[in-house]
Amino acid sequence: MLVGKKVQTF
């Protein structure tokens, strides 16, 4: 889920 940051945070 992309919450603000455009990184691989799933």
From Swiss-Prot:
Its EC number is 3.2.1.1. Optimum temperature is 60 degrees Celsius. Keywords: Carbohydrate metabolism, Glycosidase, Hydrolase, Polysaccharide degradation. It comes from the Bacteria. It is an enzyme of class 3 (hydrolase). It catalyses: Endohydrolysis of (1->4)-alpha-D-glucosidic linkages in polysaccharides containing three or more (1->4)-alpha-linked D-glucose units. Disulfide bonds: none annotated. Optimum pH is 5.0. GO terms for biological process: polysaccharide catabolic process. GO terms for molecular function: alpha-amylase activity. Belongs to the glycosyl hydrolase 13 family. On the 2D-gel the determined pI of this protein is: 5.0, its MW is: 155 kDa. This is Alpha-amylase. It comes from Cytobacillus firmus. The lineage of its organism: Bacteria, Bacillati, Bacillota, Bacilli, Bacillales.
